[in-house]
A protein has these predicted regions:
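N-terminal maturation segment of proteins
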Residues: 1-179
């Protein structure tokens, strides 16, 4: 289930297109039926808890897919950069699968961590390009709030650029294959 829950990638970015959700609907329904067929009567408590967790995750996915559709209605869904650790276990509200958690990086970056960050940053333009086609909803309040998220993300990108240029300019350009 958890492998299915991660969307497939298109041009390196998670695919949240209507076409992708339609294409995967049958597989989701099969997974749901498999879960529902399981007889948990004689299972241990911790195995039943696991079953309930997976069931709750599937219900959440289904609710997002059919009702909330944050990839259609909420520009903030496409916010990728998080400069600070959230005060909740995950992030508040729906979040995409391509987050760059800047606060998790220690500077100076090792070559591997610089490569990780570069890979995460390379996803951003493709995800935002996809957002242009996906965002067709009319949830005005989400659009108003989402604009602020992107102003903040722009500031975050400038901070990252300054920070990385100072400590890793040549290394990062090499990883991003820039002269």
């Amino acid at each position: 289930w958890r492998e299915f829950e991660k969307p497939p990638l298109t041009s390196g970015a998670p695919d949240y297109t209507t076409k992708m959700f339609s294409h995967r609907e049958e597989e989701f329904n099969l997974l749901r039926k498999e879960l529902e067929k399981m007889d948990t009567t004689n299972w241990s408590v911790h195995h039943r808890v696991d079953w309930n967790v997976v069931n709750a995750e599937m219900n959440g996915y289904d609710f997002n897919r059919r009702v909330l559709k944050p990839w259609v209605r909420d520009p903030a869904f496409y916010q990728t950069i998080w400069m600070y650790e959230s005060d909740v276990p995950a992030h508040e509200g729906p979040a995409n699968h391509a987050l760059l958690e800047f606060w998790q990086y220690e500077f100076p970056l090792t070559e591997d961590r610089a490569r990780d960050m570069a890979s995460e940053m390379e996803v951003i333009p493709n995800l935002l390009f996809q957002a242009r086609g996906n965002l067709t909803g009319n949830a005005k309040d989400l659009w108003i709030a989402g604009i602020e998220n992107f102003k903040d993300q722009q500031k975050s990108l400038l901070k990252i650029k300054t920070h990385i240029k100072k400590e890793h300019g040549k290394q990062f350009n090499k990883i991003l294959k820039k002269p």
